[in-house]
Amino acid sequence: MMAEVDAQVGRLLTALDELGATDETVVVVTSDHGEMLGDHGLMSKLGFHDQAFYIPLIVRAPGGTGIETACTGGAGQVVEGFTENIDVMPTVLDLAGAEVPRQCQGRSLRPFLDGSVADGGLPDGWRTAAHWEFDFRAWAGSRELDGLDGHLCNLAVHRDHRGKYVHFAGMAPIFFDLEGDPDECEPLGDHPLMAGYAAALLDWRMATDEQELSDHLALPGGMIV
């Protein structure tokens, strides 16, 4: 799989060179999910472990025609802050000089690309945790999940550098102390930080839950944006 991805990305980059478009093109290499590859006895993108959700994100923004200039100051930097795939679209729009819709939940990665934040630093207000959800109804018939109703077969995660909190709709939550257990081998059912992580996860869910009219409020007097 990795050899195939490497070959196809190489074909794309070669074509850009042949077209003379390399210095005018933003290249983003990322993925929609990771791969367990047998870790924790799992395959595919199952579960809540980092292997399934820790994905690559490589951005090259050369600053040529059609791309706002001065976007190479952060070249070669490895960002330790949390990014999410919802950041890709606002980043591309920002680099192209287009307006980013205000309802976008992601943020432009431009500060990391142009070097406006110091190596290892974060822009003001940048997220300090990552979140994800997983629906495992397709595996609800397994022995471990026998009797768990389909609408309860889902989980949500709040993960920062200190720990990971996993909330299940139909089972007890668990916590991983990533300082003492970085490989996530010891799920804890009780930890002093769990209540705070649960509250932070609820805050995120309430702020980002599906909205019929995103970022709009309909009142008798009209629409508030």
Regions found by a protein language model. Give the residues of each.
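A generic secondary-structure signal for well-formed alpha-helical elements
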Residues: 16, 20, 96-100, 116-117, ...
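A long, amphipathic alpha-helix that forms part
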Residues: 1-25, 204-205
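C-terminal cap/loop subdomain of S1 sulfatases and analogous C-terminal strand-loop tails that border
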Residues: 33-39, 89, 94-174, 178, ...
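Intrinsically disordered, low-complexity polar regions and short flexible loop motifs
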Residues: 181
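Histidine-centered active-site microenvironments of extracellular/periplasmic hydrolases
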Residues: 14-84
